[in-house]
Amino acid sequence: MRPWLRHLVLQALRNSRAFCGSHGKPAPLPVPQKIVATWEAISLGRQLVPEYFNFAHDVLDVWSRLEEAGHRPPNPAFWWVNGTGAEIKWSFEELGKQSRKAANVLGGACGLQPGDRMMLVLPRLPEWWLVSVACMRTGTVMIPGVTQLTEKDLKYRLQASRAKSIITSDSLAPRVDAISAECPSLQTKLLVSDSSRPGWLNFRELLREASTEHNCMRTKSRDPLAIYFTSGTTGAPKMVEHSQSSYGLGFVASGRRWVALTESDIFWNTTDTGWVKAAWTLFSAWPNGSCIFVHELPRVDAKVILNTLSKFPITTLCCVPTIFRLLVQEDLTRYQFQSLRHCLTGGEALNPDVREKWKHQTGVELYEGYGQSETVVICANPKGMKIKSGSMGKASPPYDVQIVDDEGNVLPPGEEGNVAVRIRPTRPFCFFNCYLDNPEKTAASEQGDFYITGDRARMDKDGYFWFMGRNDDVINSSSYRIGPVEVESALAEHPAVLESAVVSSPDPIRGEVVKAFIVLTPAYSSHDPEALTRELQEHVKRVTAPYKYPRKVAFVSELPKTVSGKIQRSKLRSQEWGK
């Protein structure tokens, strides 16, 4: 254990008798809070980041010791349900035991070495959290991905990241097999299944036989932890690399302040495992000793979510605004949420009327936050702070967030500009390391003393930020970031498409959706528009991830262009949004 942490834990275990009641049972102690306060001080930038840090060793194993000493309520650390009666509960001790076994699978049968990269493409199964922790224990860099990735998406990610291993489920294994021969770095394929598949190692079988003894890798704080692919407006998705500390410690403050978590809380975030919000949940909840609740939730179903909130003692809920829009359309008076005390949302703009309807029908406020794959939480409405409906909240420590013009000059309150985070003279440790293998994109994201988020907003005189839109053309539909070039490239593969432009279009449920303006080739100009629309939509679903398909299609004779011939998506977007 690191020297800076050993002192705190030994103090906790040494002093446990002093806090025992007359029956010798541990009473509520301040000691775990002292440990959390140390992590929080680092997260807030008030204490230096240690040279060495490993989340599994320095956080999870510490909570396991505190749990064993009786310094934590009897909540599980992890609680998974599938909606048909199956449940899995792990204490921190059991999580440690199972993750050490998983670490032996990665380092043994998979042959992974510290620094090697592994893709995790799994639905909401317990193995995702188990393997994530195992990656930390072995120094393996994890690369999460959504289960909707197509063969083309998987090939690009495996080739670009040079991942040596992938773990996935039965439904995606055929897609991986179809492209694995074109991915020379890929050495092992790990299957989470109760059945076998030729050419694949069965994770569950290997886990059953693995040893519980494992020495955690001694990682440096700046060593890579995770890579996330994020969509952009030009070309292929970028690789965002985060370090052991940027995620491992960077989310502690938001977990304590915005999510308001304690060791008594049970936290359910409905996010997909492939998105950064899954990592945010892990790194927010477990440092605070909280329980992560997971429902397998094969598809979003408002009634399933509401019934789950009624059945289980969930105290804290986080959903994207799209889901809250669906929930408030139900008759919420039919449900009783006896344990629910705190609700959060982020990933896209929240309509004020949704927040008001939710609060009116449940009595629970909705607290909005804002961040990116490149950062941790940038702005938020912490619990207890006055909420201004429609605002993203105030800057979250340790960030100095400003609104700047296109030259990087700070703008006064009330003026719209670029959302920027100060990175000089000191770069916040919770920032991403870089866009991997892309120094040009990394440099382009900075301007003077600031990192430019690519989003536009204004800040009022009280320091609240109000989202105005994106500088780029990325479409944010139900919190899925979709690059227009990816959709346009998919459309271009169909013989009916001469050229296309893809922009966002307003939608009452999803906030915004993909709309494609298409100029047809002469051979298809007389085709039935409705039938052709359906054909093109199905084509995009086959070529790229299904969530990227254009829900709206307009056939036009020409597209607006600049003098140099570049398509002006901004004009089409303004037309859609009435600006």
UniProtKB/Swiss-Prot annotation:
Tissues and organs where the protein is expressed, per its UniProt entry: Detected in kidney and liver.
Modified residues (N6-acetyllysine): 97, 152, 303
Protein's cellular compartments: Mitochondrion matrix
The EC number(s) this enzyme carries: 6.2.1.2
Gene Ontology BP term (one): acyl-CoA metabolic process
Keyword annotations from UniProtKB, A to Z: Acetylation, ATP-binding, Fatty acid metabolism, GTP-binding, Ligase, Lipid metabolism, Magnesium, Metal-binding, Mitochondrion, Nucleotide-binding, Transit peptide
Catalysed reactions, as listed in the record: a medium-chain fatty acid + ATP + CoA = a medium-chain fatty acyl-CoA + AMP + diphosphate
GO cellular component, as recorded: mitochondrial matrix; mitochondrion
N6-succinyllysine modification, residue list: 97, 303
Transit peptide location: 1-26
Membrane-crossing segments per the record: none
Stated role: Catalyzes the activation of fatty acids by CoA to produce an acyl-CoA, the first step in fatty acid metabolism.
PANTHER family registered for this protein in UniProt: ACYL-COENZYME A SYNTHETASE, ACYL-COENZYME A SYNTHETASE ACSM5, MITOCHONDRIAL
Membership in a protein family: Belongs to the ATP-dependent AMP-binding enzyme family.
The name this protein goes by in its record: Acyl-coenzyme A synthetase ACSM5, mitochondrial
Source lineage: Eukaryota, Metazoa, Chordata, Craniata, Vertebrata
